[in-house]
Every structure is written in C-alpha cells, then in structure tokens.
C-alpha cells in the first residue's frame, strides 16, 4: 500500500531519532526504511513524484487497534540570539484544547544527533498517560548544517539551554499547559542538559537524568573514548585548565538544585560511566534534594 506523510527513518523505536537506511538499484529505484510518528519503519519502494509503496507491514497487528498520538512541528526563536529552533509537540490522543496538561520536555543525546517526526515508544507512552511531550533540536543538533552543529564547540552545555527554555515558554503561551506541572528528562547528552537545566532553574516539578556526564574532568579520564573527548571537546587536558572543565560541568551547579531528580544509568555503561551518576547522586543527597 501507499502512504503519504511518511519519512525516512523509524529504526530507532524508543525515542524519535532521525535514523534510517536505504539502497538504490540501477534504475534509480530506492528501497528505504520509511516510518511515521505513529508507526515504526517498514520497507518501502520510493520513486520520484510518488508516495512510498510499502513492501512490509510489520506492526499493524499490534498498533492497528491502538489510538496513537500525532506530532505537530513547531518552531521558535532562541532567547539567546533569535536563532530559529525546530521541535515537535505530541499531545494526548484525546487532547482537549480547553483543558490543561502536564508537560514533559524530552531532550535528545549526542549532542550531535537529531530528533524528527518519527515513531517513539517513550513519547507515545507519555502521551497515553496524559502528558504533552515537547522534543526539539537545540543548537548542536545535526540536520541543520555544519555551522549549527558546531555552534556548541567548546561551549557545551551552554546556549542550548536557552534554546530549550524558549521552546517551553512558547508552548506555555498556547494556554493548554499547566505551568505547575513541568517535567524534564533526557539521556546521555540529554542527561547532561537535564542536569544542567535543574541547576539553572527550579521551574520543573521533577527531572529524570539518564546516563549523564556530571563532571567533565572525571569523565574524560574514565569514558571509553577518553582521548577523543579530551582533545576535541576541550582545548587542553583537565590538569592544564581545570576551570574550563568545571565551568561546563553540571556538578558546578548542584548547589542550586532543588528539583526532585531521578538518576538512571547502566552499571556497564562505558560511554557515560556509572561513576558520573554516582557523583551527582551523592552530591544531591548531601544537599538534601529528593533523589
């Protein structure tokens, strides 16, 4: 069958990452993984000026009887410099614009990756539970050109915080978000930004920080790609300029945190070692923050 409003991707079914693969034969016919915000990828044949012709239908037996949420593309200017930021809003399936809803800000990892209008098990579950979900591509994300991706060079985390907070503010202006019920979460690079956010503002009722970097100095000496991080994300080694590492570490802001914070990391995570999470957990406990 043919399907409009489909996008390349859909191979990352947990969160709405832009992922996918394709193959081209000699007559310029493309076979690709094509999905949508309501369905993970199927194989489809793609030809110019035609909707994709799907060759598989892998999940209809499961999802065909479900009421799923749709996404809406939104944009807003960053509060830092007016740079246009793209995001998507997912509302509960039975959304009523006259009601108010809690909001979850969900932040992608990387940071050099991107979200899109793709299927997301997590976002669908949040929406089914009655939450509005906002996810976005702040500066540093891929898909918007090299300059946009590299705008966080030696400055991460930083103004990406302003990009995301401006998105929350823009959604609040729509009138259907309960400003007392704001939540934030993210994993890896999203965990970095979630921990950074609760150190900068107390506007969120609770946070879930997954597999974060909390202390850049300890991270570059324990992570699996330690040499890469120390030589490309910073100008010098931590013992040569410890202040540059500290200034960008969420741990430097832990004295400001009052938001109840859940921490999640795998014990065998070599990219964002469990020792990062343990530092943050102990620091929050020392301060009496619910964690």
Which sequence ranges carry the predicted segments?
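Residue-level detector of Asp-centered blade-edge/turn motifs that repeat once per structural unit
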Residues: 25-26
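Cap/lid segment of the alpha/beta-hydrolase catalytic domain
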Residues: 50, 58-180, 187, 214, ...
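A short loop-to-beta-strand structural motif that recurs across blades of beta-propeller domains
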Residues: 42-44
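Short glycine/acidic-enriched loop and turn motifs that connect beta-strands
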Residues: 36-39
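Multi-bladed beta-propeller domains
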Residues: 1-20, 46-78
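Residue position within the beta-strands of beta-propeller blades
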Residues: 30-33
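Active-site-proximal cap/loop segments of hydrolase catalytic domains
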Residues: 122, 135-291
């Amino acid at each position: 069958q043919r399907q409009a409003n489909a996008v390349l991707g859909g191979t990352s079914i947990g969160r709405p990452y832009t992922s996918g693969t394709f193959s081209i034969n000699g007559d310029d016919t493309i076979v690709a993984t094509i999905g949508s915000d309501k369905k993970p990828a199927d194989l489809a044949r793609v030809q110019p000026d035609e909707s994709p012709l799907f060759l598989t239908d892998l999940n209809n037996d499961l999802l065909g009887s479900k009421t799923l949420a749709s996404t809406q593309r939104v944009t807003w200017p960053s509060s830092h410099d007016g740079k246009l930021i793209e995001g998507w809003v997912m509302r509960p399936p039975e959304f009523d614009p006259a009601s108010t809803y809690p909001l979850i800000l969900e932040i992608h990892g990387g940071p050099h990756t991107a979200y899109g209008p793709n299927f997301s098990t997590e976002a669908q579950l949040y929406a089914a539970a009655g939450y509005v979900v906002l996810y976005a591509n702040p500066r540093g994300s891929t898909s918007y050109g090299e300059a946009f991706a590299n705008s966080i060079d030696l400055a991460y985390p930083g103004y990406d915080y302003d990009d995301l907070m401006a998105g929350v503010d823009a959604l609040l202006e729509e009138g259907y978000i309960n400003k007392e019920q704001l939540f934030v979460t993210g994993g890896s690079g999203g965990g970095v930004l979630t921990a950074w956010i609760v150190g900068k503002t107390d506007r969120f009722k609770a946070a879930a920080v997954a597999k974060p970097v909390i202390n850049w100095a300890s991270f570059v000496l324990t992570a699996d790609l330690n040499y890469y991080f120390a030589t490309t994300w910073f100008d010098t080694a931590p013992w040569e300029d410890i202040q540059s590492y500290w200034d960008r570490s969420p741990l430097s802001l832990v004295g400001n945190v009052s938001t109840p914070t859940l921490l999640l990391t795998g014990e065998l995570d070599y990219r964002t070692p469990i020792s990062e999470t343990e530092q943050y957990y102990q620091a929050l406990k020392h301060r009496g923050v619910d964690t």
